[in-house]
Amino acid sequence: MGCTLSAEDKAAVERSKMIDRNLREDGEKAAKEVKLLLLGAGESGKSTIVKQMKIIHEDGYSEDECKQYKVVVYSNTIQSIIAIIRAMGRLKIDFGEAARADDARQLFVLAGSAEEGVMTSELAGVIKRLWRDGGVQACFSRSREYQLNDSASYYLNDLDRISQTNYIPTQQDVLRTRVKTTGIVETHFTFKELYFKMFDVGGQRSERKKWIHCFEGVTAIIFCVALSDYDLVLAEDEEMNRMHESMKLFDSICNNKWFTDTSIILFLNKKDLFEEKIKRSPLTICYPEYTGSNTYEEAAAYIQCQFEDLNRRKDTKEVYTHFTCATDTKNVQFVFDAVTDVIIKNNLKECGLY
């Protein structure tokens, strides 16, 4: 009879080959689809990272899209100057010039026009005079004692440009805008032959209950921490230090049983703000046991250790840490390139292709 196969056996062999081929194709397809979850406390820079993905991987914001951000730029600018003026009352700081009190009253009267995306020359003049005032600057230098947008000085220092009638926000202006994320924002893009699905979820405590259904099938978690938050308290709980809240949250994510096989990427963000702040605000505000110097390198390395030490599975799970400045496109591009290489390697391993 020899080794000839019956028609039935041949069909079985073909079926087996087809199953193997399908399994491999499914594995390759899974390896090519990447689900990224962006987590972190409120105002840690998650949404800015998402905006950078659009700039880096999707040709950025069109002129029409930029125009839509004009109202947000104006709103952020006015919210910032109003926050400073209100804090002056609480901190008992007087205006450098008495006439500025009239400007402050005018500010509250005129502020409404900016909500429609219009900044009148009268309103711009009022804000400029207030921002130049010695008392306002003294209050701004104490911004850790109240809630203020990171982008406050960026917009207020550039009022001449942003108050022009023909003003169109730049990509950088868009990156600097702050809108509280509610719910889940999903972004898709392709990079290095991978199809990315990135989910940005609100960081405030009230938003966290919405995270849970995003967790299934996650390839990697990018956890954002604002380094510059070490001397600040939460917007939603003024008793809680923001860095301590971040550590608590990172601990619960990093050691969660659902994420045993999920890559954890730690973005220690706002390194530019941290570098400036550490010169005048000691790290002991957050970590009383810290005995090192208040230099960027030593203080940043200490914070990195505090987070990495929370990983209770060091022997089997690695935390990939990067120092980032989410508003710097080149920095984010460089870091995300390195992150993608780690994801490719880990993803292929999981699918048995590496």
UniProtKB/Swiss-Prot annotation:
Outcome reported for the amino acid change (mutating T48N): Fails to bind GTP. Prevents endothelin-mediated activation of GNAQ. Results in increased frequency of developmental defects compared to wild-type when ectopically expressed in Xenopus laevis embryos
Binding site for Mg(2+): S47, T181
Effect annotated for changing R208A: Dramatically decreases binding to CCDC88A
Keyword terms, alphabetized: Cell cycle, Cell division, Cell membrane, Cytoplasm, Cytoskeleton, GTP-binding, Lipoprotein, Magnesium, Membrane, Metal-binding, Myristate, Nucleotide-binding, Palmitate, Transducer
Subcellular location: Cytoplasm; Cell membrane; Cytoplasm, Cytoskeleton, Microtubule organizing center, Centrosome
Location (main, coarse): cytoplasm
Impact after mutating K248E: Abolishes binding to NUCB1
Lipid-linked residues (N-myristoyl glycine): G2
Region (G1 motif): 35-48
ATP-binding among keywords: no
Entry function: Heterotrimeric guanine nucleotide-binding proteins (G proteins) function as transducers downstream of G protein-coupled receptors (GPCRs) in numerous signaling cascades. The alpha chain contains the guanine nucleotide binding site and alternates between an active, GTP-bound state and an inactive, GDP-bound state. Signaling by an activated GPCR promotes GDP release and GTP binding. The alpha subunit has a low GTPase activity that converts bound GTP to GDP, thereby terminating the signal. Both GDP release and GTP hydrolysis are modulated by numerous regulatory proteins.
Protein name: Guanine nucleotide-binding protein G(i) subunit alpha-3
